[in-house]
Amino acid sequence: MSRYWSDIVRQLEPYVPGEQPALAHPVKLNTNENPYPPSPRALDAIRRELGDTGEALRRYPDPVARRLRETVAAYHGIAPEQVFAGNGSDEVLAHAFQALLQHDRPLRFPDITYSFYPTYARLYRVAYETVPLAGDFSIVVDDYLDDAGCVLFPNPNAPTGRALPLADIERIVAANPSSVVVIDEAYVDFGAESAVSLIARYPNLLVVHTVSKARSLAGMRVGFAFGDAALIDALTRVKDSFNSYPLDRLAQVATQASYEDEAWFQATRKQVIASRERLVGALAALGFDVVPSAANFVFARPRSHDAATLAAQLKQREIFVRHFKLPRIDQHLRITVGSDAECDALVAALRELLAA
């Protein structure tokens, strides 16, 4: 702490990202990265943009990412004016907190959810309330039907992996006409129903996506928001008051190319889903209680061992999973669905540790 810090900095509890180990060959199952490389078309697009000399890099990128937004809009069947592109979905969410979620009534989100939400709320001084999940970690839809303020939640939820059906999401959006409802769909491609199809009917709906998970571009830092043009304009006003050039040239062309390679996207997405079901079965056989998942991770509780201890023991073997020291979930582990080989290494290590 420094005497030069502002009051808001003194009060912050910053988000703690998953560990990025500096090891040659870790089994890295702690940050929900895709185990497969991005589309070859994305790599080709980067090479073309660079050329032989890298001449393009001396120029600023398109500040509105026009071609990328047009491609993504066409992919989802919406207008480019309904698409906002930002430097990762976390930045997109940050802009939403500033542009759309700061009102007299408190923002509402689940008590067990993405831990950046309370961090942003404190940073931007957005009053908020947490709404308890049910005992099985599902969102209680009836708790959000009173039009009592803005609503934010991931679908599928993180870190639990549970998903709400689209009909329930529509009930929440329809019940809150005077407030913005933000659905964070970082993991939607692994088994949930997207709410993008509802945008045309609900001007209060904002849907956030990322290319970090299903499109294997976490290193590019690209995220999107989809919604009514007025909501997108609000995000753009905040962006242009903060950073007019959030997406670099390489990120724009790589992401555009990835959306143009549907075959690669579908093949890798389906492989992750198949590996998830395989991992769920293996963990259940070891005596874990596994929460039903529609994401690229599983949330599992060891019945006979302490979760934090298991995570530490796995780390000693260079196998990384995520443990959250938080109420209600401190006996669970969030485990990314890696390649089958990575998942096999995890299961083998767990089998030894549980038998010790």
Curated annotation (Swiss-Prot):
GO terms for biological process: L-histidine biosynthetic process. It holds the Pfam family Aminotran_1_2. The keyword Amino-acid biosynthesis applies. The modification N6-(pyridoxal phosphate)lysine is found at K213. It catalyses: L-histidinol phosphate + 2-oxoglutarate = 3-(imidazol-4-yl)-2-oxopropyl phosphate + L-glutamate. Homodimer. Belongs to the class-II pyridoxal-phosphate-dependent aminotransferase family. Histidinol-phosphate aminotransferase subfamily. This is Histidinol-phosphate aminotransferase 2.
